[in-house]
Every structure is written in C-alpha cells, then in structure tokens.
Regions:
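Active-site acidic catalytic loop and adjacent metal/ATP-binding pocket
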Residues: 23-37, 45, 169-215
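Regulatory N- and C-terminal appendages and interdomain linkers associated
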Residues: 1-18, 280-301
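Short secondary-structure junctions
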Residues: 10-19, 67-70, 176, 246
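An alpha-helical support segment within catalytic cores of ATP-dependent transferases
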Residues: 2-14, 120-185
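Active-site activation/catalytic loop segments of kinase-like enzymes and analogous catalytic loops
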Residues: 213-247, 260-281, 292-296
Length: 301
C-alpha cells in the first residue's frame, strides 16, 4: 500500500506500471522511501520528498555529481510545485544504523575525508560561480542563525547562546580563512550510510551545502560511540589518516568542535523556527542539542 502523496505521481511515471512489489523503508513528514521490485526482477529505490526535501534531485545535479562524489545513480525524477519523486539505484540493502560495526564506522570516517578532499578539488573546476554562491553557507549565515536563536522565545535566555555569541565570530573567521570550501552532507548519520561490503556510500543529500566546517564528523563520532562503542580518538585517527590536507591532530579536534557548533546552530534554527511543527516529537530533541552546544562552547572558550 502506498500513500496518496506517492500515488499522485503514478500517472506521471510510466515505470511504476511495472512495479510488482512496494516495500516501505522509511517514512516521516517530509519524506517517504520505498524499495520497488519491477517485473524484470530488478529493484529500484523510489523517494518522495516534500518542501526542502524536494530539492534532493537538484542537489545531485548541481552539487554531488559535478563534485564527483560517489552516490546512487538517479534514473529519473519528477518535480511538482512543493514535492518531488526520484527513481534511484538500489545501492545497498542495509545501512550502519541497521548493522552497526566498528570497522565500518571507521571506514565512514575515512570516506568522509575522501569526499571532502574530492569536493574541494572539484568545486571551482566543475561548478558555475552562480551555483557556488547559491549553495555556500557563509560565516555570516552561521552568525545570523546564532542571532536568530538568541531572538527565539524558547532559547533567548539560555546562557550557552550568550557565550556562543561572544566566541562565534572569531572562531568562524578562523575557520573560513584557514580551511577550504568543501561539501557538507549535514545528515551524515548511520541511517544514511549504506554498507557495500567493506565500503560505505552516503545517501540522502537533500540538505547538503558548501562550507569548510566539519560538523559531519562531529555527528559521526557521536553515533560511532553510541552504536559500536568506537572511541573518539580512533574515529579522529581514521579521518586523519585519509586526509590529503596537512593538519595536526590538535587542529583537527578544533575543526570538529567548531564544526559541531555550526551543525548545531543550523539544526536548532530549523527546529525552533518551524521544524518542531513538521516532525512530531522533535520538540524533545532541543534540550539535548542545547546541552551539546553548551559542552562544545566550553571546549572552545
């Protein structure tokens, strides 16, 4: 059984007449993902996205593919005013959330380093200037997100935001002046890391953008510890071993901390300005995210 919002596309997608089986893989307010089986026996992934999640096909065309990032093949996509459907390669049955494994978390860290180096090398070579500007989150953007959090009724009185306000401008200036622009996934979590033997393929680039920050590694380190008890130092070492850029371990630790702050500020901004209305229960995420932000601020001060 498929939802009305997916069935609305059936007349627009001839391939769906060939589907013999639908298997729902994931569903939430702004996204539905199915594995579909065709009469030929082949499988594909069908993904419906609403609102900001509808831009994933555009992100593949303008970001992921031009930057030569390994990703599932997009066979076709169909866009309407407020939603879109993609037909994608079925690139793997299990992800790291379903089958957590210490060595694969370490490989995910190494893969992230390779992705960032590849993206940096190809941004100016393969992306039009207009797309670079369109997809770049600047230091000013992150400062604006932080100021918006200070103005939000729910978080305005939180002391961590006042401390962040004091240190963030200088830290962002250092980040953007010392680190190259690269691709940020912004949802580099176990659920989006497909297992391909001993390799990892990230999927779901719907909210990706360009920035130097390393929030993706911050998130991955937390999940590696939660799911597979992989120590933080081992994850940092794995990432460091795959980097092409010359960087000390101390510099890398700082990058992860400031990257974590960038990730938290952008995520919290989305949540408190409408995200909690979109995702039932997400209001409960905010206190933990603020505790995390407070901890990172204390590490940098």
């Amino acid at each position: 059984m498929i939802s009305e919002r997916v069935s609305a596309y059936c007349t627009k997608i001839p391939l769906l007449a060939e589907v013999t089986e639908w298997a729902l893989l994931r569903e939430w307010a702004l996204s539905e993902v199915y594995r579909i089986t065709l009469r030929s026996g082949e499988t594909r992934i069908l993904k419906w996205g609403g609102k900001e999640m509808a831009q994933e096909a555009a992100n593949y065309r303008r970001l992921v593919n031009p930057l030569h990032i390994v990703a599932p093949r997009i066979f076709d996509f169909y866009e309407s005013e407020r939603s879109a459907v993609m037909i994608m390669e079925d690139a793997g049955k299990y992800n790291l959330e379903q089958q957590p494994c210490p060595e694969l978390f370490l490989e995910a860290a190494r893969q992230l380093a390779r992705i960032r180096d590849t993206a940096t090398m190809n941004i100016e070579k393969n992306m039009p200037i207009s797309h670079i500007h369109q997809y770049t989150e600047t230091a000013f953007d992150f400062l604006t997100h932080a100021k918006d959090l200070l103005r939000s009724p729910r978080l305005a009185d939180h002391s961590a935001l006042s401390k962040l306000h004091d240190i963030f401008p200088q830290q962002l200036e250092r980040l953007y002046h010392t680190q190259p622009l690269t691709l940020v996934h912004h949802d580099y979590h176990a659920k989006n890391l497909l297992i391909q033997g001993t390799q990892i393929m990230p999927i779901d680039w719907s909210i990706s953008y360009l920035s130097p920050h390393l929030g993706d590694l911050h998130c991955l380190i937390d999940e590696a510890r939660e799911y597979s008890h992989v120590p933080r130092e081992e994850m940092l070492s794995a990432f460091h071993s795959a980097m092409e850029q010359d960087c000390s371990m101390e510099q890398l630790k700082w990058q992860v901390n400031i990257g974590g702050l960038c990730w938290l500020v952008k995520t919290l901004k989305w949540l408190v300005y409408g995200g909690t209305d979109t995702i039932p229960g997400s209001d409960e995420w905010v206190p933990d995210l603020m505790d995390e932000l407070e901890l990172l601020v204390s590490k940098i001060v």
